[in-house]
Regions:
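Catalytic domains of riboflavin
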Residues: 2-165
């Protein structure tokens, strides 16, 4: 459901769970946000230890990438980008918003099909379009809503794609 008087579209996420997560990069607070507690794919926020949320906050919005983050695929740099963001935010404070929208939000099965087309010479956008899918179907409204829930209103957005801003 989407609502909001100020024209922002919200999904009505709620904080469902949180814990401290020790990582190779330092300690983070891990928070899970979803509409319902039983949602098995919540959006996640990793907040570096010592982060002040009432000042300008470093933010990295990262979309899930199973092939790059878990299997270290050479077809993308997502795993390396996430590692670099975790290192930077651990050292400088901030939040990583991990949005559950695999393969530009086309899902893992369609992403595998797109990979197969890439083996035939198509790039990512061409492969998605050939499959009848959008070039990029990601929705960043959950990131806005999570930042709103956390009370963050001044950000320094960390990106490797400034042309997408």
């Amino acid at each position: 459901m989407y609502y909001r008087n100020d024209l922002k579209f919200y999904i009505m996420l709620k904080l469902q769970a949180e814990t401290t997560l020790p990582t190779d990069f330092g300690n983070f607070k891990l928070l899970a946000f979803s509409e319902k507690e039983e949602d098995w794919m919540p959006h996640l926020a990793l907040i570096a230890e010592g982060t002040e949320l009432d000042t300008v906050t470093n933010i990295r919005i990262h979309s899930e990438c199973i092939t790059g983050e878990i299997f270290h695929s050479r077809k993308c740099e997502c795993g390396q980008q996430l590692d670099a963001a975790m290192k930077y935010i651990s050292e400088n404070g901030g939040i990583i918003l991990y949005l559950r929208q695999e393969g530009r939000n086309i899902g893992i099965i369609n992403k595998i099909k797109a990979y197969q087309l890439q083996e035939k010479g198509f790039d990512t956008v061409e492969a998605n379009l050939k499959l009848g899918l959008p070039a990029d179907d990601r929705d960043f409204n959950p990131a806005i809503e999570i930042l709103d829930i956390l009370g963050v209103d001044k950000i320094n957005l960390l990106t490797n794609n400034p042309e997408k801003m």
